[in-house]
């Protein structure tokens, strides 16, 4: 009966894939999975798993680790990746408890690639968030073997009867998932990249970044131990994937499709290289976290160090000299320690006391910090600026792409809602995002922080991030459904440890900037070596313009 039912299946989105028994259903989707591969991919798949091994044979943990070059004892490998293979072996019966097979691994490769998943399931789109949460959740009771009919379409659409809206997954599993995804985000340059087990030895460092992502879903999670007693809902996970870390799955398909390349066609070239420039903020780990939001190829290959306050000095004028010639987008990074007690700091630091007189701090009743913010003092912010920097002592600059990003202790995204939205005040006002210009007068100074704003004082010693809700130039935060006790307003006042600006952009922007620098250097050289023979009109014109002469070397204008 099962064979007769499957022989009449048509593969269109309007057809019904119905089967009279479980084995016929699984056999059909196994055969369909193999048909998704080209002849070359099928050959490579069989070469990798072993010429004499059938795809339906059992796959143990060590064999899977060998296939992908990952140590079998890494927690995310055993608790996440191997679980995916186990649960998808009998797809679309995801609650079936059959032993994992190589066919299950092939289905993982197909279902985590958008195009392949759409063809395999005959759906225009496939919700990765739903699939991941369903796989991480404990399996429910499998289908009754005595049912009269297995409906393949219904099993796919409902993920084998999973109530997605009611899903709750242990937070520790989501933490393992993020650690897995972050490690391959940094490592995988392409789908034919060969990875070494030694690359995954420092997975604990990635777990610390993963905690920042996890806290964006649940701000009551402070440490790994908290994750063992918390759960993440589908609404939280889907909201985070939509607006906090939209690129977190970008490298998963590349990692999985290593299976479709034979050894001679693979490369050990990695996406990242060890950071050459000295930086206390911008490390490969931080770039990996930032690549959950921005294209990772630009972050790992096209970042240009422009200004590091720890080396060049905490100075607005040095910032201006180092950054203002860069005509492509930039990212400003600020790291610091949250000031917990203003009174104690004021007694030790008179400059901070003066700053508080200029900057109207929130009242205690309005200061409602989340638990993870209260427990974690180290803060990191990144601000993406597309417009070239310029001095604006009266007006503002910055377009709708300006984005304030909190990276630690949790990741939150604050997008521009109005433009312009930035000032660089060179007469004592400092740097501000989301605020109107401060009032700087001989009698005193006054800041006017916006509802969602980030302010750096002119000495680059203190910074303040304020979030009191809607109504400002920036959104109030990422669109993750929050529990009822979520703080409505808060302010982070921090003592700056370091401040850096890095040029950002694709290869085209980088080449244009290099060409501009080369042109400016050539022009400066021409001016410097103009002959000073009597009657030289060029020299006279340049002296009149104040470009050369009077002890000036003739640098770029």
Swiss-Prot record:
One of its GO terms (biological process) is protein-containing complex disassembly. The keyword Cytoplasm applies. Keywords: Cytoplasm. It is found in: Cytoplasm. Belongs to the RTC5 family. PROSITE patterns: TLDC. The gene is RTC5. May be involved in a process influencing telomere capping. SMART domains: TLDc. Its main location: cytoplasm. The keyword Cytoplasm applies. It holds the Pfam family TLD. This is Restriction of telomere capping protein 5. One of its GO terms (cellular component) is fungal-type vacuole membrane. Residues 280-505 form the TLDc domain.
């Amino acid at each position: 009966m099962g064979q007769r039912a499957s022989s009449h299946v048509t593969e269109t989105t309007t057809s019904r894939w119905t089967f009279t028994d479980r084995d016929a259903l699984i056999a059909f989707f196994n055969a369909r999975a193999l048909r998704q591969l080209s002849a070359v991919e099928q050959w490579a798949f069989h070469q990798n798993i072993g010429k004499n091994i059938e795809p339906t044979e059992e796959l143990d943990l060590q064999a899977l680790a060998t296939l992908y070059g990952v140590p079998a004892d890494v927690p995310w490998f055993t608790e996440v990746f191997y679980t995916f293979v186990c649960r998808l072996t009998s797809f679309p019966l995801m609650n079936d408890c059959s032993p994992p097979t190589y066919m299950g691994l092939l289905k993982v490769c197909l279902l985590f690639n958008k195009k392949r998943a759409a063809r395999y399931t005959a759906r225009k789109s496939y919700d990765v968030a739903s699939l991941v949460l369903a796989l991480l959740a404990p399996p429910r009771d499998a289908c009754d073997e005595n049912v009269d009919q297995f409906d393949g379409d219904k099993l796919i659409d409902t993920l084998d009867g999973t109530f997605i809206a009611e899903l709750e997954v242990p937070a520790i599993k989501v933490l393992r998932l993020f650690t897995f995804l972050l490690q391959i985000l940094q490592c995988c340059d392409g789908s034919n990249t060969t990875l070494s087990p030694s690359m995954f030895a420092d997975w604990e460092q990635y777990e610390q970044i993963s905690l920042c992502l996890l806290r964006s879903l649940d701000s009551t999670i402070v440490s790994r131990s908290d994750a063992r007693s918390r759960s993440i809902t589908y609404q939280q996970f889907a909201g985070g994937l939509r607006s906090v870390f939209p690129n977190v799955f970008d490298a998963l398909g590349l990692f999985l499709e290593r299976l479709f390349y034979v050894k001679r066609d693979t490369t050990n070239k990695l996406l990242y290289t060890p950071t050459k420039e000295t930086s206390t903020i911008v490390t490969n780990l931080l770039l990996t976290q930032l690549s959950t939001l921005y294209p990772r190829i630009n972050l790992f290959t096209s970042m240009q160090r422009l200004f590091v306050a720890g080396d060049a000095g905490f100075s607005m004028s040095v910032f201006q000299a180092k950054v203002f010639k860069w005509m492509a987008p930039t990212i400003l990074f600020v790291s610091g320690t949250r000031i917990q007690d203003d009174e104690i700091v004021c007694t030790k630091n008179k400059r901070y006391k003066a700053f508080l007189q200029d900057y109207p701090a929130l009242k205690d009743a309005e200061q409602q910090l989340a638990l993870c913010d209260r427990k974690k003092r180290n803060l990191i912010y990144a601000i993406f600026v597309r417009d070239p920097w310029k001095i604006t002592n009266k007006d503002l600059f910055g377009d709708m792409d300006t984005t304030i990003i909190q990276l630690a202790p949790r990741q939150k995204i604050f997008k521009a809602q109005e433009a312009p939205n930035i000032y660089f005040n060179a007469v004592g006002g400092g740097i501000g995002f989301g605020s109107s210009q401060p009032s700087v007068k001989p009698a005193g100074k006054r800041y006017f922080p916006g509802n969602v704003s980030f302010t750096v004082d002119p000495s680059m010693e203190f910074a303040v991030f304020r979030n009191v809700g809607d109504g400002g130039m920036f959104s109030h935060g990422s669109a993750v459904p929050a529990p009822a006790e979520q703080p409505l307003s808060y302010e982070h006042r921090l003592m700056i440890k370091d401040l850096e600006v890095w040029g950002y952009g694709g290869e085209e922007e980088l080449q244009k900037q290099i060409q501009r620098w080369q042109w400016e250097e050539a022009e400066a050289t021409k001016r410097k070596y103009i002959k000073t023979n009597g009657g030289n009109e060029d020299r006279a014109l340049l002296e009149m313009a104040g470009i050369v002469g009077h002890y000036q070397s003739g640098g770029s204008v």
